[in-house]
Amino acid sequence: MSDEGSRGSRLPLALPPASQGCSSGGGGGGSSAGGSGNSRPPRNLQGLLQMAITAGSEEPDPPPEPMSEERRQWLQEAMSAAFRGQREEVEQMKSCLRVLSQPMPPTAGEAEQAADQQEREGALELLADLCENMDNAADFCQLSGMHLLVGRYLEAGAAGLRWRAAQLIGTCSQNVAAIQEQVLGLGALRKLLRLLDRDACDTVRVKALFAISCLVREQEAGLLQFLRLDGFSVLMRAMQQQVQKLKVKSAFLLQNLLVGHPEHKGTLCSMGMVQQLVALVRTEHSPFHEHVLGALCSLVTDFPQGVRECREPELGLEELLRHRCQLLQQHEEYQEELEFCEKLLQTCFSSPADDSMDR
């Protein structure tokens, strides 16, 4: 599954109570069998079964056929299994949290410590699987699971615990504003940026970046925190590392933030982002350059200051881009990178009225 992929949902743990607006005022006429708009929603499994059986019965044509006893029994068993599955998943999460809530063994032997860590890692992995479902993710947060992750496991001694905690935070947070707000309120972003910037384990850094992305993309409060914590500088340092996956994902996030939040282009230019991106393009060619050039394109689009900085003679960007275009012409797999090069040449070096960019 991709970092920002679609996520499933399921039936609620409890059916909603009947609407107060339908049951109050107007006397007993509102509960007559005549109008489907005034019927009470089911309060239990039997009521939901009855609703499923009678659904569509008010359609005049064709008339409903009576449900066979065999089909009625199958439907009831299927729905019972669905409700039972929901309860079981919540119990699984509670069991995992009991494991994770235990204090770390202070004076255990090496074998005991390894077994304890393996059990905790297994609990985090199971939670990550369960929380792919948005309702489970919400239940996990209601069970105070997020407090445990941020408070203890992002800074755990074992790298296997740190990266699994970061992954779980990202899994729960992606595309769910309420969970994002809770995570941000717990101070997770500062810890995640520290992991991305300083952790000795590459996997921890990659998973921390995933969680950061889930907290700042399409989340204004997260982006503001990211800015206050100098997140763009951390992102640039990540792009300068030797870990290909980290470089690509960092450049992709930068490009995404530039497209979605062009108001921060001035901040990035003042940090020397143009010069640093060009320096990255000058490194040995790799697929990572596509995302760097994409970020550079986003930085100069409709932004004269970015264009002026790209034109600085000491950068030698025009010559670099023309040489790169020649290199990529015969390679179909680099078509997007070639298009970014051509767009940069057009935007920064092909305008007949250069002075107009200074206005």
From Swiss-Prot:
Top-level lineage group: Eukaryota
Residue(s) carrying Phosphoserine: 351, 356
Keyword flag Plastid: no
Pfam families: Fes1
Region named Disordered: 1-71
GO terms of biological process kind: positive regulation of proteasomal ubiquitin-dependent protein catabolic process; positive regulation of protein ubiquitination; protein folding
ARM repeat boundaries on the chain: 132-174, 177-217, 220-259, 262-301
Keywords, sorted A to Z: Phosphoprotein, Repeat
One GO MF term attached to the UniProt entry: molecular sequestering activity
Tissue expression per record: Ubiquitous.
Keyword DNA-binding: no
Amino acid composition bias (Gly residues), ranges on this chain: 23-37
Gene Ontology cellular-component terms listed: endoplasmic reticulum; extracellular space
Function (record text): Inhibits HSPA1A chaperone activity by changing the conformation of the ATP-binding domain of HSPA1A and interfering with ATP binding. Interferes with ubiquitination mediated by STUB1 and inhibits chaperone-assisted degradation of immature CFTR.
Quaternary organization: Interacts with the ATP-binding domain of HSPA1A. Detected in a ternary complex containing STUB1, HSPA1A and HSPBP1. Interacts with PGLYRP1; this interaction blocks the cytotoxic activity of the PGLYRP1-HSPA1A complex.
Protein name: Hsp70-binding protein 1
Gene transcribed to yield this protein: HSPBP1
